[in-house]
């Protein structure tokens, strides 16, 4: 009797958790769609005087990046809190209670589905095969996290990469508004973008694979089964290869801007010297 009661309670809790996840994913999807189609138009026109002068294509990308920034700040900050204070997943990174992390993962999943639709419906404007690969890899991993309760800590750790997106998007906003490349705001944002991207997307790579190596073959790892083990490794490799490619591109751009600034300063010094 007691065993059957516990089983019933466990089943009920799991069903409630599943409903909560589905509701969060759907709510997230709807909210980010509303942000893209309505809120960003209204908000951007009031915050930036240059928004109304942009072409329709530019406005579409602008709005998608506003949504991206909102998502990144939301899941990034919440993810950072969970990374330091969610005792359940910190204590057991492989099978710890994913209740709070699931909220973050479900929110991110709703955004990824929303953004995939936006990209597909506006392919000629913002279509990018790398974003499709990135989103599909993320959704695949999140599906298994949300349905099995495994690897919640790792999934949340990967979400911290979103903390770099606001700086990447801000660079695009400056470019769309035709801010001078050497303006103080542009240069500071560029440096911050490079540093933050490196910290949350590149420095985090070695610890991730060291942890994978340390748990490989253990009983909790074996419990995953072949499918989850494969998804963990394959999706991480795909995302990390893309992050390294983007990091190289960002670093080259940052070095180029810094070298041009030095050249401009050297010219100014030379001109001042001649004038003196």
Swiss-Prot record:
- Location of N6-acetyllysine modifications: 178
Keyword flag Coiled coil? no
Give the way it sits in the membrane. Answer: Multi-pass membrane protein
Q: Name one GO cellular component term.
A: membrane
Keywords, comma-separated and alphabetical:
Acetylation, Membrane, Transmembrane, Transmembrane helix
Residue stretches spanning the membrane = 20-40, 66-86, 101-121, 130-150, 191-211, 224-244
| Transmembrane keyword on record | yes
**What Pfam families is this protein classified in?**
TRAM_LAG1_CLN8
* Residue ranges of every copy of the TLC domain listed in the record: 57-259
SS bond list: none
List locations, semicolon-separated: Membrane
Q: Which family does it belong to?
A: Belongs to the TLCD4 family.
This protein's name: TLC domain-containing protein 4
């Amino acid at each position: 009797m007691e065993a059957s009661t516990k089983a019933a309670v466990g089943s009920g809790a799991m069903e409630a958790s599943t409903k909560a996840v589905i509701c969060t994913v759907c709510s997230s999807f709807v909210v980010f769609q509303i942000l893209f189609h309505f809120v960003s138009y209204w908000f951007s026109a009031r915050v930036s005087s240059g928004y109304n002068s942009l072409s329709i294509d530019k406005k579409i990308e602008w709005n998608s990046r506003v949504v991206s920034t909102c998502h990144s700040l939301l899941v990034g900050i919440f993810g950072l809190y969970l990374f330091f204070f969610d005792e359940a997943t910190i204590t057991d990174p492989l099978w710890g209670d994913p209740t709070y992390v699931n909220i973050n993962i479900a929110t991110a999943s709703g955004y990824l589905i929303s953004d995939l639709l936006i990209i597909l419906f506006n392919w000629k404007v913002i279509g990018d095969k790398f974003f499709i690969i990135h989103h599909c890899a993320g959704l695949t991993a999140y599906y298994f996290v949300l349905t099995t309760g495994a690897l919640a800590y790792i999934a949340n750790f990967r979400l911290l990469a979103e903390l770099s997106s606001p700086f990447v998007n801000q660079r695009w906003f400056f470019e769309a508004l035709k801010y001078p490349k050497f303006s103080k705001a542009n240069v500071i944002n560029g440096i911050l973008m490079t540093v933050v991207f490196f910290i949350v997307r590149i420095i985090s790579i070695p610890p991730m694979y060291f942890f994978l190596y340390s748990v490989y073959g253990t009983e909790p790892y074996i419990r995953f089964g072949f499918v989850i083990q494969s998804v963990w490794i394959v999706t991480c490799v795909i995302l990390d290869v893309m992050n390294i490619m983007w990091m190289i591109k960002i670093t080259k751009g940052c070095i180029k801007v810094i070298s041009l600034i030095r050249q401009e300063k050297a010219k100014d010094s030379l001109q001042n010297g001649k004038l003196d």
